[in-house]
Design a protein with these regions (language model features):
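An alpha-helical, amphipathic repeat domain used for nucleic-acid recognition
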Residues: 1-168
Length: 168
């Protein structure tokens, strides 16, 4: 009886810790599972392996059910932040989402929320930043834009736009 009470208290404390962690920013299920394993390993009295697996599933179910963990919401947030603040292109953002454990379909859906012209505007803005370097190091600027995650078509469009502006 006392052991059951201790386990229940530890389980509740672990879940509360995870809820607080998830409240900081949007998290994916894979990130939550990784953190759960970390929380379980750092407990002063870790549960038995079979109990730990049960707790992990209970916690994931609870976090998802209460809205702390949502892959789609996390993907949309990640897409918005990395486009607006880091000026990443769609390819790099998709790779980042896949690394966080977001499924391809959810990642594609979050990328579709951004209109194509907004991606192109970001590529144009980044190309404009490097306009002074363009004549001497065109290949370097192209590689830089590609590494930022923009598809070749957007890179060429951005560079063509700069060249047509300079011709005018």
């Amino acid at each position: 009886m006392e052991q059951d009470l201790k386990e229940k208290k530890a389980q509740t404390a672990g879940l509360a810790r995870l809820q607080k962690w998830c409240g900081v920013r949007d998290r994916t299920e894979q990130e939550a599972r990784t953190k759960i394993k970390e929380v379980l390993s750092k407990m002063s009295e870790p549960p038995a392996p079979s109990t730990a697996l049960d707790w992990e599933e209970d916690w994931v179910e609870s976090l998802c059910g209460e809205g702390y963990v949502d892959d789609a919401r996390c993907a949309e947030s990640y897409t918005r932040v990395h486009l607006d603040h880091k000026r990443w292109g769609p390819l790099k953002i998709k790779a980042g989402l896949r690394a966080r454990g977001v499924s391809s379909s959810v990642a594609e859906a979050s990328l579709r929320t951004v209109p194509t012209h907004q991606w192109q505007d970001a590529a144009d803005e980044l190309a404009l930043r490097r306009v002074a370097e363009l004549e001497a190091n065109r290949d370097r600027v192209i590689r830089w834009l590609l590494q930022r995650g923009f598809p070749q078509s957007m890179v060429w469009t951005a560079l063509d736009g700069l060249e047509s502006d300079s011709d005018s």
